[in-house]
Amino acid sequence: MSRSEALFAQAQKHIPGGVNSPVRAFKSVGGTPLFFKHAEGAYVIDEDDKRYVDYVGSWGPMILGHGHPEVLDAVRNQLQHGLSYGAPTAMETEMADLVCSIVPSMEMVRMVSSGTEATMSAIRLARGYTGRDAIIKFEGCYHGHSDSLLVKAGSGLLTQGVPSSAGVPADFAKHTLTLPFNDIAAVEKTLAEVGQTVACIIVEPVAGNMNCVPPAPGFLEGLREQCDKHGVVLIFDEVMTGFRVSLGGAQGYYGITPDLSTFGKIVGGGMPVGCFGGKREIMGCIAPLGPVYQAGTLSGNPLAMAAGLTTLKLISRPGFHDELTAFTSRMLDGLQQRADAAGVPFVTTQAGAMFGLYFSGADDIVTFDDVMASDAERFKRFFHLMLEGGVYLAPSAFEAGFTSIAHGDKELQITLDAAERAFAKLK
């Protein structure tokens, strides 16, 4: 029995499902989840001392690679001064100044402790600002596990939301409308009928929880136009895309300005951090300035601020994102070439240093239906074949992949060699 198998058996005694986040259980790909004990650069090392080129990156935060020395030094330095104060610090102000300078739409920002907390707070703020209750989200987009967002609508565009998780009251979920991603006509129709009741539209500008689906031409522009027309707050959930697809996130990459934005992952440098912010007029509704309450014991935690500040400064250097995007493109091109040579139907998608892999014969992946039509069973086999070859991908056909600046030519060759062997077995 491997160490991971033994640890998983032990974990299941007192941890539901043996994991603290469902995707880690390998339910989507089968087998025993790997337990990691160390990570360095572009690699993760499991409890049996096997090394893997890592394309999960803790689900996005590790854009510098694991254990970057300057980030570790910043955290060590802060450790000498205490773990948490529950009071304002200079680093919080420095972080706010830096985030607002990087992302022009962020006129004010509030730090929180997770991406879920950021999206939950942004929606509450939009409701408080507009005095409206309904929200619009998109099929296949995940915005954390708060009650109002664990909803998927029925087949009609205006079908009231029904919970997709037990424990979410139907009366609460009914305020959430779910529309098809990349379908601006559905948005126009919905807002024409019920726009006066809608507080906000929240969207992943690149849908990262149905693998990686970039916005169709005109989709984000259409959202901005429709929100302006109907007085609806436009929220970009940039928990995944922020500081990754470009320094200024997806809004910088695509040139669209939201009213509010949420961030997580990279902004904490690997620590549990999120933030939300946007227009000063809207942010002025947050307590203690306004009537919308939001608070958190560990918000602005100094250890997290030290890691996040250092990370944001390092990725702000000229050329950083160009280099990272170029590596990602080379890797995806290499995978596509090898799949084509093996005669395996395969499509890749990319937004900066974020990517998607689909076993599909489609020309492109644009909609939720395109994603669901891909071959998840073939992905399962591919995932395990890549593991055998020393490459760790997201253990789900519906999760995005991430590269880091620590990935280089050596890691690229390991990846492409493993993929060539895998595709040959998938014919």
Swiss-Prot record:
GO terms for biological process: protoporphyrinogen IX biosynthetic process. Homodimer. Pfam families: Aminotran_3. Belongs to the class-III pyridoxal-phosphate-dependent aminotransferase family. HemL subfamily. This is Glutamate-1-semialdehyde 2,1-aminomutase. It catalyses: (S)-4-amino-5-oxopentanoate = 5-aminolevulinate. The keyword Cell membrane does not apply.
